[in-house]
Every structure is written in structure tokens, then in C-alpha cells.
């Protein structure tokens, strides 16, 4: 029996957590879950570097993890969502304890898990462009491996990403290559999300509509044509791509709304059920509250869409 200490407290209890290649007994009074066992993290040089934090943001980590926000027993829908915050592949939030998006989904009976993934400029990485996807795949496997513990239906586990987090999320949903196997018991679980919710999402690395900062940080300032094509996720859509909801502001000056449009066109061409909502105002990075005008409706639209897609009950 392995014992793991976690850093954040939430109310009540003990549960058994099937983790790595064995069984871990941990206290549900803790909510931070590391993604990889010691010495088994792929794409790592083996450096153990402290988190780099400044002005409320995390700029580097060699300890990728998820933060769990389980739904209350009385309103648990059985659905789950992996939330990927934005930050241009430069930074992530440093405090996950009050993540508004996670708390919103949790309040609706959806089990929420917030991903803190490795960032491409980490000195520990061998292939920087692979790390966010590796961590996202592993997170999905952890959620499904422990579905019974959180009363989750493994067939209703999706991903939600904002801005560059939308690129991580859409990469997770479209790229077929398994880049996260490490030879433990979690490898057997699917990393593919059942649905995607992409808000102000970076999708394409094509010059005309690219968010240059995200592209340069992930694949370099002078990437090959092949690399640009591979990480322009509209090119990776197939009929197997998960059903998707796209939300964007038409006046987004950071990530052009054409990112969502080209992804919708690819989904439509492949016959994937998809919905797109482009609101006139609100700029970049809608939140679950305090959006202007009609954009204030997007969280309600997301809930109705999840019902329509049979991900949560009516």
C-alpha cells in the first residue's frame, strides 16, 4: 500500500484510489492528485525543479497534477469534465482552490477536474510540444480509472478548455497517437474525451488566424510546415472526433473567432455533431460569469447542450 500526501483540503472521508500500478489509500480531505509516479513521467530529463510562481501565475512545473472538485452525492449527474485553463502556453493559474469554472460545473452536478500541465519552456522537457498532451491524456486515464470512486460514467467524461487551454483540449480530442503510456495499470483506460467545450479556443496555427504566442511557445518561432499542419487541429478532425461546443467572441482580438469557425467547418464536414455560438462582444476568454450582453448566456447554453447530447440528465 502506497501512501500519498496531498496539499489541499476539502470536506470528509476516505476513499481508495486505484493509482499508478497499485492501489493507493488517500483521504478525500485532499484534492490535489499527481499525474505521474516518481521516475515514470514521460518526456522528462529527470530534473526536480520547484514550481516557478510570480504574481499569481505558475510559469513552470515539473509536478503536473489535477485538482478534483467531485460533485455532491445528491446531485451527481455521473458526468465529468477535465478543465484546461488558458495562458498562452506561457503560464497557468497558481491557485486552483477556487477555480470558478470548476465550481460552476460542480454546482451543476458535474465532477470537475482542473489540469495543471507542464509548460513547453520547462528545462526538464525533451520534446516540449508533447508535454501538455501527455499530461492531458494521463489525466483522462486517472479520471476513468477511478470512475466508480466518484460515481462517474466513463462514457461521459469530456474536456473543457479556454484560450490556449482550448488548444490542449482540442489536441486531446483530435490527435490519435497515444503519447502517455508508461507500462502501468492506467494504460488500459481511454484518454479520448466524450465531448469538448472550447471557449475562445486556440485551434489553428496557420498564419492568417494564429495566436502567435501560443504557437511560438509550443512548437517554436520557426516551425516546419509539417509541425504547423499537425498542431492546427482542424486538420486532425475525423468522424471519430468527439461532439463539440464552440463559444467565441466576434471581437476577440487575441484569438480570432475564425479559430472556432474553421474547427466547426471541419467537424461539420466529418459529420461530427457540433454547435457554435459567436457572440458580438466580450473580447477574449469568457468566464462563467460577468460576460457582457448576450455572451452572459453561454454557461446556460453549455448546460442545455450537454443535455441535448445526453451527457447529463434533462
Residue spans for each PLM region:
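N-terminal cap/lid segment of alpha/beta-hydrolase-fold proteins
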Residues: 30-75
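Mobile cap/lid helix-loop segments that gate and shape the active-site cleft of serine hydrolases
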Residues: 53, 201-236, 242
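Catalytic nucleophile-loop/oxyanion-hole region of alpha/beta-hydrolase
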Residues: 93-94, 99-101, 117-154, 292-296
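C-terminal catalytic histidine-bearing segment of alpha/beta-hydrolase fold enzymes
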Residues: 261-314
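Short beta-strand element of the alpha/beta-hydrolase
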Residues: 77-86
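Short beta-strand/loop motif that positions the catalytic acidic residue
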Residues: 246-248, 252
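Primarily recognizes the serine-hydrolase "nucleophile elbow" in alpha/beta-hydrolase
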Residues: 138-210, 228
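Conserved alpha/beta-hydrolase "acid-adjacent" motif
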Residues: 253-259
Amino acid at each position: 500500500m502506497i501512501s500519498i500526501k496531498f496539499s489541499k483540503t476539502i470536506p470528509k472521508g476516505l476513499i481508495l484510489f486505484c493509482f499508478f500500478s497499485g492501489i493507493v489509500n488517500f483521504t478525500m480531505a485532499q484534492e490535489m492528485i499527481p499525474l505521474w509516479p516518481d521516475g515514470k513521467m514521460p518526456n522528462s530529463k529527470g530534473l526536480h525543479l520547484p514550481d516557478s510562481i510570480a504574481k499569481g501565475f505558475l510559469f513552470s512545473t515539473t509536478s503536473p497534477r489535477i485538482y478534483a472538485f467531485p460533485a455532491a452525492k445528491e446531485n451527481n449527474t455521473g458526468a465529468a469534465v477535465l478543465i484546461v485553463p488558458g495562458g498562452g502556453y506561457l503560464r497557468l493559474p497558481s491557485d486552483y482552490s477556487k477555480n470558478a469554472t470548476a465550481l460552476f460545473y460542480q454546482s451543476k452536478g458535474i465532477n470537475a477536474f482542473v489540469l495543471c500541465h507542464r509548460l513547453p519552456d520547462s528545462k526538464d522537457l525533451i520534446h516540449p510540444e508533447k508535454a501538455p498532451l501527455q499530461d492531458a491524456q494521463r489525466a483522462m486515464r486517472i479520471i476513468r480509472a477511478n470512475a466508480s470512486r466518484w460515481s462517474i460514467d466513463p462514457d461521459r467524461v469530456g474536456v473543457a478548455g479556454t484560450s490556449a487551454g482550448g488548444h490542449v483540449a482540442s489536441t486531446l480530442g483530435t490527435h490519435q497517437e497515444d503519447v502517455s503510456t508508461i507500462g502501468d495499470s492506467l494504460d488500459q483506460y481511454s484518454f479520448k474525451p466524450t465531448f469538448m467545450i472550447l471557449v475562445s479556443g486556440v485551434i489553428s496555427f496557420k498564419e492568417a488566424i494564429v495566436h502567435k504566442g501560443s504557437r511560438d511557445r509550443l512548437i517554436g518561432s520557426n516551425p516546419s510546415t509539417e509541425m504547423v499542419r499537425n498542431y492546427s487541429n482542424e486538420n486532425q478532425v475525423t468522424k471519430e472526433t468527439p461532439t463539440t461546443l464552440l463559444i467565441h467572441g466576434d471581437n476577440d482580438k487575441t484569438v480570432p473567432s475564425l479559430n472556432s469557425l474553421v474547427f466547426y467547418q471541419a467537424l461539420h464536414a466529418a459529420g461530427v455533431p457540433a454547435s457554435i455560438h459567436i457572440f458580438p462582444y466580450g473580447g477574449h476568454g469568457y468566464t462563467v460569469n460577468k460576460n457582457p450582453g448576450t455572451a452572459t448566456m453561454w454557461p446556460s447554453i453549455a448546460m442545455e447542450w450537454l443535455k441535448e447530447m445526453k451527457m447529463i440528465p434533462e
